[in-house]
Amino acid sequence: MPVAPTYPGVYIEEIPSGVHTLTGVSTSITAFIGYTARGTVNDPVHIFSFADFERAFGGLDGASPLSHCVKHFFQNGGTDAYVVRVAQGAAAATVTLRSATGPVLDVSAASSGTWGNSLQLDVEYATSNPASLFNLKVTEYIERNGTMVPGRAEMFRNLTLNGFDANYAVAMVNAQSQLIALTKNAALAFAGNGRSTSDTLTLADVNPMPAGYRVAYTINGVGPYEITVPVPTAPGATAATGATAAMNDIAAAITAKSPPGVTAAIVGTNQIEFTAVTDLAHPSERSSIHFFDAGTNSVTARLKLGLANGGTEIDAAATTRPLSTGTTGTVVLPVAFAATGSVTMDVLKGAGALPIAAGIVVPIWGAPTARPVPASLDEAVAQLNNALSGLAPAQPLLAGATAQRIGNTIRVLPGSDDPNVSFRFTVGATATSFGLDAATARNVGHYAPGVGVTALAQMQGAGGNNGMPPAATDLSGNEAAKTGLYALENVDLFNILVMPDATVGAGLMGVLTEAIAYCSRRRAFMIIDAPETVGTFAQAQTWMGSTASPLRSRNSAIYFPRLREPDPTKNGIVGTFPAAGALAGLYARTDAERGVWKAPAGTTANIVGATGLSYTLTDRENGALNPLGLNALRTFPVIGTVSWGARTGRGADALADEYKYIPVRRLALFLEESLYRGTQWVVFEPNDEPLWSRVRLNLGAFMHTLFAQGAFQGKTPRDAYFVKCDKETTTPNDVDLGRVNIVVGFAPLKPAEFVIIQIQQIVQALQT
């Protein structure tokens, strides 16, 4: 860059070289559009292997020609693809979760399909703040050997429904989950205020209070605020009244120095409770108050404020938490551990009031068990787990049931495969101490999208539906909505398009013509199979000579016949499949091995995986179809099944099109896309000879690299290509209009389609 000399000496100035390296784009990124067993609808998914396809779309499916095409693509050399799932009537499994007061969260599977009916959700409060936050676990169950077993699982911790919090459940889950999506229920309403309550204080805690000591806190997520705690007035006649008087002084001082909206009161047994009055801009949702240590001279711990110091903090949003799954009881402290301990429970299903198993007695310790009286609550919970496990053989409905301590609560979770099962406890001494009695908060064992019934804190949603194979309108989609074909608007670059569903039904010619036009716009190439109704040479000849006219494009190639191979989805019965996926893989393999300028045809262009073809063409039949621009698939002894044609949709002899051959057209598309992306730097540069020379330099270097790789005809660069950008291509009028005109020419390599060998006898001269 230019320097500004100010002192005598030597200066270094860096001068731009004018080099902008132009890199060729990929040539074989393939887009597949059509029906799959499952997956997100109208959302392009980038995959790099068939295993990726299986994970995202469910693998091979008898109703999905696309699934077989994707398999063939990767078998034949493809490495990079996008898949757009299109289906009629596809729906995601849903369910609504309730709090103690009403519906709060709508849950849907991440994509449509019956797979979402196998999701189970667990909500529990074992968080950093059990009084305010919740954890959400999502598990996908999959079938394995006839049994549903856990598959993918996700865990989201310390969530809240306060939309202004960093741990806002909807934002956090939707940003990270591959299994579900959350939405706030329309009926969700916030009420009340956030509050922070100290642990029990004594006179020694609050008086005497050293001068200059401080506390820190946030209010409604704003802060932190730090204030100095005043020295309280002299205590009263007794320790209790003295503590109360000192606490009143401290509370009054803190509220006086706080922003408007903070109130304080003495509650319980010598506890200070601070309340954050509703934020008027966002009533109750963000109402909260949290104490923590001040930067210096902190007395937050001495006043037992904040979670870390034994206090409790409950945000207003806590009342909107979805109820914990399972059955949760509040322990009566201190727990009275009698000589024997047991609970009695019923097992219920769904909304039914009548148990499916009633009066199950669960001995926890003492007679008739050999377990000793527990010494602590944690030990009692461990013994409850042992008791539940021990009863499982005789009571199968208790199989897998577990108990968990969360703060001063005990949560008992069913282990049943049925998510609608719940436990109800009946009154008893041990049950009451544990909080596991008739008044216990009972909920379904697991929230279940799609199959969960309306019961307790669960509201039944819609079942997941895979949908049906798409109609023409589904495949074409809508450009404004970016659906169907136009879902590819969300893909930066693709080179090849395959739509197998558009060739397996009636009335789909319009879809193909629209897709070809879209390919022309995106500088892509479409591979098309002759319709499944075209099964013989005569039908192919008739169809190609008339019906296929709308498909004649430089940006398409049409192939006949189809592939045959055993179908794994039908017990290995040999089936017929579109060849487009295998051909796209062949294109990719040829590009990698030889270059985009090599025709994807010939004896080396074998189709991997195919055991045969739906029709066997003879040389004469092939010779009749080739001049029409219909590319043949052939099977030869030893060689196997190969691609035996290299013509575009405009490749009929009668059309005499300059882009008759596939490699010529695909090379041109490669050049166009590469030059388009590689010359963006030219925009807004000064439009004169220095710019034009840099254009010639950079584009010339790119074209010369291709020449050296054998992409063009000619022995010398002059014979093979040219780049022109000067005052002849860009006139003064062009400059005034803001235009730079660049002319790039190339001499394409055309395939040797017909090999003619001339043979003659050598005749000895006759002696006369």
Which residue ranges define each predicted feature?
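Long, low-complexity, polar/charged, intrinsically disordered or flexibly structured peripheral segments
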Residues: 447-476, 481
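Short, flexible domain-boundary/linker segments around small modular repeats
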Residues: 195, 317-326
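Structured, hydrophobic secondary-structure cores that serve as assembly/anchoring elements
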Residues: 1-96, 105-110, 129, 199, ...
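Catalytic P-loop NTP-binding/switch module of NTPases
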Residues: 194-202
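Intrinsic disorder/low-complexity signature
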Residues: 171, 182, 245, 306, ...
